[in-house]
Design a protein with these regions (language model features):
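N-terminal export signals
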Residues: 6-27
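Non-catalytic cap/lid and distal C-terminal segments of serine-dependent acyl enzymes
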Residues: 30-315
Length: 315
């Protein structure tokens, strides 16, 4: 069990009656026995972070062992927060084990000081919150898209609302209560699968807030079969909205088995678009990991690489 001392005091406001964030606050609780625990650093938890835009959900903030509340830290916002730290608490017995990978890298000087904000998904809303609304608005009416809307989205597309929750409610609360660097050069997004899609979308929609993103195993196809419609909508959007070269950084990758085996064509199209638009290494990277699949164990095994990309110490 991690001892909680000298933790930053986090707060979220009661939003009942339209009350603005900051009007009232509640301290987070320590994780219970059935919730995520960490082996390195400290974890603080809002059991239900309130929002005017999306349903309330748990949010956890990981503080590295060196965090003392005085030195400003970069902030990495990660999606699917319930899968980030503790395999004993997840539905599939796997986790990213972010604390175990990041803490020794920070201690060794391989990464700048940073904290992680793990945003839990709401399973019933995950596709609706992570599928970019701009993609959805551009989809043609076809059997593929009709099936996707009926079977996956199931409701109105909530990704714009989800990003507003992060930018307008969650980030101000974290910045107010933790020692953070608040500029875009220290504020990043990371996710896998659908979380990769929303991370890239967030980078494009809020370039003044997020300076870089990492998208692992990006689920460009939307469903479980290759299709042309959803990748085409993504490409058209990226052509319009991706920040100009030199004004953003983006890490992408994929494996070659399981669902990741279906991403080769779409990811190749995205890679070609990046080159066409003038985005080149080292500011934009796309990597392939042979033999790796679509699961937390795979993402954990290569997590050090996107962490270095996002958080390499400043010269």
């Amino acid at each position: 069990m991690i001892t909680r001392r000298d933790c930053c005091v986090l707060a979220a406001s009661a939003l009942a009656g339209g009350m603005a964030l900051g009007a009232a606050s509640v301290a987070p609780t320590a994780p219970g026995a059935s919730e995520q625990q960490v082996q390195s650093g400290r974890l603080e938890r809002w059991s239900a972070f309130p929002s005017q835009f999306v349903p309330a959900r748990p949010v956890e903030v990981w503080l590295p062992p060196s965090y003392d509340g005085r030195r400003p830290h970069a902030v990495l916002y990660m999606h699917d927060g319930q899968m980030l730290f503790d395999p004993r608490s997840t539905w599939n017995g796997q986790a990213w084990c972010v604390d175990q990978i990041a803490a020794p890298m920070i201690a060794a000087g391989q990464l700048r000081d940073f904290i992680v904000v793990g945003i839990w998904n709401r399973p019933e809303h995950r596709h609706a919150e992570f599928f970019p609304k701009a993609y959805a608005d551009a989809l043609p009416d076809s059997p593929v898209t009709q099936h996707y809307r009926a079977e996956r989205l199931k409701s109105e597309v909530l990704s714009d609302a989800y990003l507003r929750f992060i930018v307008e409610e969650l980030k101000p609360a974290v910045d107010a209560r933790c020692a953070t660097e608040r500029g875009r050069d220290a504020t990043f997004l990371m996710g896998s699968s659908m979380g990769g899609m929303i991370s890239i979308y967030g980078l494009c929609e809020y370039p003044q807030v997020f300076g870089a993103a990492a998208a692992l195993s990006t689920h460009w196809i939307g469903g479980h079969e290759r299709n042309a419609e959803i990748p085409a909508a993504a490409l058209a959007y990226l052509r319009r909205k991706l920040p100009p070269p030199g004004q953003c950084r983006l890490y992408m990758d994929r494996g070659t088995v399981e669902l990741d085996a279906l991403y080769d064509q779409a990811q190749a199209q995205v890679d070609a678009l990046m080159v066409e638009l003038g985005h080149k290494p080292p500011r934009v990277l796309s990597r392939v990991f042979e033999g790796q699949g679509h699961n937390e164990r795979a993402w954990s095994s290569r997590l050090a690489q996107p962490l270095r990309f996002l958080l390499e110490p400043r010269a």
